[in-house]
């Protein structure tokens, strides 16, 4: 099986020093609307995909060019995935706080490796 990429947006608290759990169990201290964006790559597995890499887009404050913000970089990478790959369609999976952030991403990876639309795989964006 090929590797699986999952995009994400989250309002969880960012823990940049914690390599095992980059986002915690609480809301971002800056408020529920303070979002961070990124992507995670998994080694595909039909039962439990394995997280290989996690990239958090930089949180660029006071940047007038939206494409240079974390949200802008996220949207551009997702647009490219939809425009130039077999994954033309995208599903947004909203996951709550009842599991870890990594657990939510892993659930998204399971969906990304199994869902198809018109015989083609789909992109998955996890919001947790």
Question: Predicted regions: what is each one?
Answer:
Residues 1-125:
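Flexible, membrane-associating and regulatory peripheral segments of lipid-active enzymes
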């Amino acid at each position: 099986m090929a590797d699986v990429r999952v995009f994400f947006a989250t309002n969880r608290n960012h823990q940049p020093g914690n390599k095992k759990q980059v986002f915690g169990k609480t809301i971002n201290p800056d408020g529920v609307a303070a979002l961070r964006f990124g992507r995670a790559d998994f080694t595909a597995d039909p039962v439990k995909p394995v997280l290989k890499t996690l990239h958090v887009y930089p949180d660029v404050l006071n940047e007038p060019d939206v494409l240079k913000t974390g949200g802008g970089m996220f949207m551009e990478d997702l647009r490219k995935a939809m425009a130039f790959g077999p994954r033309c369609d995208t599903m947004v999976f909203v996951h709550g706080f009842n599991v870890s952030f990594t657990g939510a991403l892993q659930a998204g990876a399971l969906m990304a490796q199994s869902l198809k639309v018109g015989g083609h795989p789909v992109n998955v964006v996890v919001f947790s």
